[in-house]
């Protein structure tokens, strides 16, 4: 075996991970080498990258253009049995158990796939705080997957690599599938499986890069809260005075747009922890959606798409130009890039002090939630556990039916402990820091129109500069929320949602409908004392 070192670090032994007769190990290659490797003329199929006119390489991830939660499994053993939030028929989630025996078969499959090959090894960190980060090793035979990992995790220094020992190993065998899946009782021939005793993730059948990123997020979501550290699906930024704000929100609520603010430096756009020192990014890069991307609307992201960025599933024309409007392959077109491709970031390390503002973003398509409400600690836990947003289904003009989504902690797909654990740790951190929480509706109101981005930005500014604290408030019934009656730069007629309806009874009827959905959804958290105690903080129907 030869080890092609692109660092001064000592060579590595992959036999301890189960690999045999590896032809060559390419460890932590430079971006230049990855560019050459992923665009080689002899590559075929999903391995081959195409150079675009922006300088970034574009790849196709095959039939999987998003994560495959139905193919996610975790070994149930002495390590995980007690703390893991296992799926149940009553409250299904993505944490499905498998036995050690099934794991052994899948590990054999993946190690057979990677043995005897030339492999790329990327060593990096998940977590910007050295005390609590996970040292991650990813092994793959596909150059662009190594590139994705280099972009998304925190890149070690030469010195750190010299003594690098992985806490967690990801073996990506995208080219192999499990023909015994029925015998194993699995969902399909594809798999992404975790063993927390062996501290390893195995991937087979899917080429989608996000499985590696979100896999490690799920692991941080397991290990950190058990140490009293908040693990959060949120964006974070910092003001000129060092004040930190965090933004929770599901897809389409404005998390990236509102945290990318010329007046504030970005800490990170997706995954963060909060420990005794403050808020820190888990990642060394960003993974942004590119569907309908334009330079005018999102200049920061557009300008980040250059050499070293990696595009996924976009349409590249013969001349190398990109059609960002084309969603024929998937609406989930993406780009990964190292965080330093964004100009206004917190440097040299993506971390800040304790957050003093926590913002829950919800796009309410029912049109009944206030544009902004200040939350009590109990309401903070309630709305964090609810993780509500709603989309308008249908593309016709006129009336469409709102579809509610409740995703615990604004990221249920990535939770590995019971949701109440995350709420408990977050609120404890907030109380220690004296942080305030706000629920911000970036969706609709009684006018039938979406709340304008100008008004929403005005609301966010009022939260961040503290002027919302000086505003007079009033009580909005049913949702049991306190709302300001005026804010600088915000249309005062929208602040009480009842005022946006010609007939206030129409608001009441819709509000009761949504309140009942909140109540029905929250019932699943009342299986413990913590959840039961929060019911009074949510919507109330007489």
From Swiss-Prot:
One of its GO terms (biological process) is gluconeogenesis. Keywords: ATP-binding, Cytoplasm, Decarboxylase, Gluconeogenesis, Lyase, Manganese, Metal-binding, Nucleotide-binding. CDD domains: PEPCK_ATP. Binds 1 Mn(2+) ion per subunit. Its cofactor is Mn(2+). Its main location: cytoplasm. The keyword Lyase applies. Mn(2+) binds at residues 214, 233, 270. Pathway: Carbohydrate biosynthesis; gluconeogenesis. It holds the Pfam family PEPCK_ATP. ATP binds at residues 214, 233, 249-257, 298, 334, 450-451, 456. The keyword Ribosomal protein does not apply. PROSITE patterns: PEPCK_ATP (PS00532). Its EC number is 4.1.1.49. It catalyses: oxaloacetate + ATP = phosphoenolpyruvate + ADP + CO2. Substrate binds at residues 67, 208, 214, 334. It is found in: Cytoplasm. Coiled coil: none annotated. GO terms for molecular function: ATP binding; metal ion binding; phosphoenolpyruvate carboxykinase (ATP) activity. HAMAP family: PEPCK_ATP. Monomer. NCBIfam families: pckA, PRK09344.1-1, PRK09344.1-2, PRK09344.1-3. Involved in the gluconeogenesis. Catalyzes the conversion of oxaloacetate (OAA) to phosphoenolpyruvate (PEP) through direct phosphoryl transfer between the nucleoside triphosphate and OAA. Belongs to the phosphoenolpyruvate carboxykinase (ATP) family. This is Phosphoenolpyruvate carboxykinase (ATP). It comes from Vibrio vulnificus (strain CMCP6). The lineage of its organism: Bacteria, Pseudomonadati, Pseudomonadota, Gammaproteobacteria, Vibrionales.
